[in-house]
Amino acid sequence: MSYLIKNGWILNENGEKTQADIRVTGETITAIGKLDATDNETVIDAKGLLVSPGFVDLHVHFREPGGEKKETIETGAKAAARGGYTTVAAMPNTRPVPDTKEQMEWVQNRIKETSCVRVLPYASITIRQIGDEMTNFEALKEAGAFAFTDDGVGIQTAGMMYEAMKRAAAIDKAIVAHCEDNSLIYGGSVHEGTFSKANGLNGIPSVCESVHIARDVLLAEAANCHYHVCHISTKESVRVVRDAKKAGIRVTAEVSPHHLLLCDEDIPGLDTNYKMNPPLRSPEDRAALIEGLLDGTIDFIATDHAPHTEEEKNTEMKLAPFGIVGLETAFPLLYTHFVKNGSWSLKQLIDYMTIKPCEAFGLPYGTLQTGQAADITLIDLEKEAVIDKETFLSKGKNTPFNGISCTGWPVATIAAGKLAYEEGRLVK
Amino acid sequence: MSYLIKNGWILNENGEKTQADIRVTGETITAIGKLDATDNETVIDAKGLLVSPGFVDLHVHFREPGGEKKETIETGAKAAARGGYTTVAAMPNTRPVPDTKEQMEWVQNRIKETSCVRVLPYASITIRQIGDEMTNFEALKEAGAFAFTDDGVGIQTAGMMYEAMKRAAAIDKAIVAHCEDNSLIYGGSVHEGTFSKANGLNGIPSVCESVHIARDVLLAEAANCHYHVCHISTKESVRVVRDAKKAGIRVTAEVSPHHLLLCDEDIPGLDTNYKMNPPLRSPEDRAALIEGLLDGTIDFIATDHAPHTEEEKNTEMKLAPFGIVGLETAFPLLYTHFVKNGSWSLKQLIDYMTIKPCEAFGLPYGTLQTGQAADITLIDLEKEAVIDKETFLSKGKNTPFNGISCTGWPVATIAAGKLAYEEGRLVK
């Protein structure tokens, strides 16, 4: 299949708008510039649209196997494509956990069979993510594991994390950490702060996260391992990562859209669509996250897309599962809040969602270049619409942003040269 | 009892030698200047001697109760006085541990009955220092606990340390931490480095210490607790403390003479007198400790005086207990190495052993001032002698410095107005 994306504009190195047509042949970009259509290619009229590299989200939960009621690889991938994502990395906290070569191969096949975007599967660090016994890293790497993580739970002992880091470093893979010290959770369902006190809820103190990061950056230094911090959420964590980077430690970090956009004081009431892990923190934490993203302490944005059924979320704050969806709302929310109404440049936002995650993990995606994978997202920056969870292609409707009006929506997504999503008005 | 210390010289604010006589009446200094003897006072001729504030060592092991073969409060105090120390803080890893009001009162009485210097007893953080259950901080404070520590073992769970810090902060006491993650000890008896590899010994990696400090400074920040790091030994630990101080966290740290003087490459062979915990680290670690002391990251020097019987130490490296004595060798070694043959000023060294520990813990000692406690040490900076463990007043002879020639020896010590030690040629 061959496409010619005509009349759109791209952002150049300096973030300036530049008119450019893009030719896609098979899975790759084969030409960029002023191009005329050839016979056997489908023209996509991108007039007035931003032609962006496909977004990259290195933290999604597709729930398959075992949680198909919440999401499947197929529905998750469709949601990603609709959100403009062409590459996602799927967390291993499924049932079963991909902690063996066979399990990983099953997931890979499932991706091949059902996914419309590139899905990079994480393998778990420990068997069944219980934290006691390490998985076979070498075998899992061979089976295509993207990196290793027990996301959803923290690695509780330093010794286990240190051994995992040494093993990961030996096979040039990253350790990706959900940072949570179980002895500091206190049965909390929200951040230990204004909201928890006002509502008589147990709160999860910021140290629950920051102490693991502080531990792990030292272990990563000693093991010379690439250590990546999932969903960073506290100002102290940002400081620890900043100091670690200053010391030359190979640490990267991601932040979620919801932690950039909301803090605990924004939680309107006991609405479980505002319950995620880590929780929404204080205004000072949110400010520190934004500052950390802007000064490079935090490397990129990742949604931590975590679908649950409405039934699961339809209970009290203490009992509801943690997590919200994010793939289909990330760009509109972030563009509206930080670019259109904020101080970020468009390029900054695009980079946080494309090239930055790829640079952090050495992935050959996230840019528009001849010869590179044809991962392309067309964005209508003028389009205004209200977030409507009923239109989500994700099975998960658990979002706190339902009803919010946003500007700037992805309207078509080409993943590895295939049209993965399109609002039905572009392709001729 | 009243003393007049005549003809000695003291160091003024700028570290300059100044002739000054000092009158001691009862427990306090009552006059400093050009003084003439009165009838009923004993004159101590301090001609040619440095008259220093008494040294303060906030980390000693006096082994009583339960370890009287190694040391008693009495013998330890005598060793302290001989080393020029007038105040010491005694660690609670005795048998039994002072983890109740009654035990603490027993120790206090023992100190009153047998000690010739001021001994401030630590109480333990957890019952029997096992790490599971917190002691009654309020009761132990009432019984005179100086601060709280489980020295000898690390507090393994963040939750326990956090609760302890909150409790200590509430009663304005410090948490003093032996930083050691049990999951990172690997059965090591020396530092994981050159010496361990050359001798086929399990090594204790630096992260074993540094990860606890990194955890604890964040907990201390959240709990607003004074957190003190015992016997800091690694370059990463110095960096973590430096960053924490920069962030305004109430952390202080001590370093031992042996970690300033020796590294693992100095260990001549399988000599258990070079075995202590934390172990002697790399040359780079030693350099970082010196730098950290000089730039204020590390607050003061403490010996971690840890006597063992010669029988206990007379075994293989793996089996011997950790620890060396230090009270009777600290000043001569440090003065010789860092002042006489080094770049430190005399005042720097004296401050690290007197006012700095007192400032860190708010103790009213460590200076020569009218009205202050008469804690005074006379030092012959010209005296040259060889360290001879057989002359030690400590029961412990376990030192790696035996036979080393040093210059600069304490020759008399007045503790709270009483002559606690004197070489027999001064008092008239």
Swiss-Prot record, chains A, B:
It catalyses: (S)-dihydroorotate + H2O = N-carbamoyl-L-aspartate + H(+). Keywords: Hydrolase, Metal-binding, Pyrimidine biosynthesis, Zinc. GO terms for biological process: 'de novo' UMP biosynthetic process; purine nucleobase catabolic process. The lineage of its organism: Bacteria, Bacillati, Bacillota, Bacilli, Bacillales. The gene is pyrC. The keyword Zinc applies. Substrate binds at residues 61-63, 93, 277, 308, 322-323. This is Dihydroorotase. Catalyzes the reversible cyclization of carbamoyl aspartate to dihydroorotate. Pfam families: Amidohydro_1 (PF01979). Binds 2 Zn(2+) ions per subunit. The active site is at 304. Its cofactor is Zn(2+). CDD domains: DHOase_IIa. It comes from Bacillus subtilis (strain 168).
